[in-house]
């Protein structure tokens, strides 16, 4: 099987291992206003605890505080559909979301103040089922109860349609169980409300579910079906995964559905702050990885991708100073 060759993604294979958002936005706004007089205070908007992005934000916040002298607050929200406009409006200084969510948000809402920092790491994902079931492939989901909807992460439905398309399925071929976000979907899976849930590898929630239900399995995706998947979502690709503590549920070498996770900011954040953020996370990668193993994939060169969202001037200066050219989509 020929999988997409990803030098930075291969690093993951080694080593161990929308209403609610208004409350989060208000809390973050209060924090930022109260700290306005304090220089270099940052708010990082992310998803709820247990998600991959919350762990990533926690790792970045710790490094920025300990290594760059920045006062940082991690602010959970209901989902990426909340995070992106929140950051664009300046109610958060930094946000983390997947590349598709960012593209759609900008196209729909004309978020002219949003600025890209870079692609922080790949986002490997899967449909998971109980290990005790006979389900092994995406095709086996036909007629099964599957999480769907994702009102706080609207573009997840697009990704799910792409994954289902790899086996000739559409959402109409499964029994849709509506959830607001992936964390709720995982909780419904544990409670027995669905047969399969969708999540990113490396998230604490995946480990929690695996331990709670006595083992989970990641469903295999046929490489031959990726042509159909790209008609739904062009940026998705299969990347290699092997059984290890990071890839929980992977029972043998296989390809897992992947795309990029982005770090972004807004036009009001000072250039030197963005420069300092990039410099700190690149230089202190080892510290990041102790908290978030997915950040093994982080490289300075990997940050600078081609994207429809303009880069923040601070990021542009960092890439220029370090002679890092832009690269195409993976």
Residue ranges with predicted function:
Residues 69, 79-82, 89, 112, ...:
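Extracytoplasmic
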Residues 183-184, 191-192, 200-218, 223, ...:
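An extracytoplasmic/periplasmic, membrane-proximal ligand-sensing/linker region
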Residues 40-67, 72-73, 123-191, 285, ...:
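Bilobed "Venus flytrap"/periplasmic-binding protein-like clamshell domains
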Residues 33-39:
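Sec/Tat signal peptide C-region and signal peptidase I cleavage site
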Residues 151-162, 237-307:
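Ligand-binding clefts/hinges and TM-proximal coupling segments of bilobed small-molecule sensing domains
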Residues 98-101, 108-109, 133, 170-177, ...:
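Pocket-lining segment of extracytoplasmic ligand-binding domains
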Residues 1-16:
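N-terminal secretory signal peptides that target proteins for export/translocation
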Residues 88, 92-122, 204-207:
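Acidic, polar ligand-binding/catalytic clefts
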């Amino acid at each position: 099987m020929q999988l997409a060759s990803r030098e930075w993604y291969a690093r993951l294979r080694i080593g161990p291992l929308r209403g609610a958002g208004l409350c989060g936005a208000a809390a973050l706004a209060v924090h930022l206003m109260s700290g306005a007089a304090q220089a270099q205070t940052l708010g990082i908007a992310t998803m709820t605890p247990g998600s991959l992005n919350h762990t990533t934000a926690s790792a970045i916040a710790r490094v920025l505080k300990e290594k760059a002298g920045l006062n940082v607050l991690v602010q959970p929200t209901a989902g990426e559909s909340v995070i992106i406009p929140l950051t664009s409006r300046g109610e958060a200084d930094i946000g983390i979301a997947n590349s598709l969510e960012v593209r759609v948000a900008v196209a729909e809402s004309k978020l002219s103040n949003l600025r890209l920092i870079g692609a922080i790491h790949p986002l490997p994902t899967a449909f998971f089922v109980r290990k005790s079931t006979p389900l092994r492939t995406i095709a086996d989901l036909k007629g099964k109860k599957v999480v769907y909807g994702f009102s706080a992460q609207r573009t997840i439905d697009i990704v799910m349609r792409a994954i289902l398309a790899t086996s000739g399925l559409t959402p109409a071929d499964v029994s849709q169980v509506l959830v607001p976000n992936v964390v709720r979907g995982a909780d419904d899976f544990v409670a027995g409300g669905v047969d399969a849930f969708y999540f990113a590898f490396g998230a604490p929630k995946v480990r929690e579910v695996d331990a709670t239900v006595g083992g989970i399995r990641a469903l295999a995706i046929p490489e031959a079906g990726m042509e159909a998947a790209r008609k739904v979502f062009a940026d998705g690709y299969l990347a290699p995964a092997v059984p290890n503590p990071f890839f929980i549920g992977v029972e043998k070498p296989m390809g897992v559905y992947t795309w990029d996770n982005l770090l972004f900011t807004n036009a009001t954040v000072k250039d030197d702050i963005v420069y300092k953020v990039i410099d700190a996370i690149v230089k202190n990668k080892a510290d990041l990885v102790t908290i978030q193993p997915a950040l093994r994939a982080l490289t300075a060169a990997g940050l600078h991708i081609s994207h429809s969202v303009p880069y923040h001037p601070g990021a542009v200066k960092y890439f220029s100073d370090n002679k890092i050219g832009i690269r195409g989509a993976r």
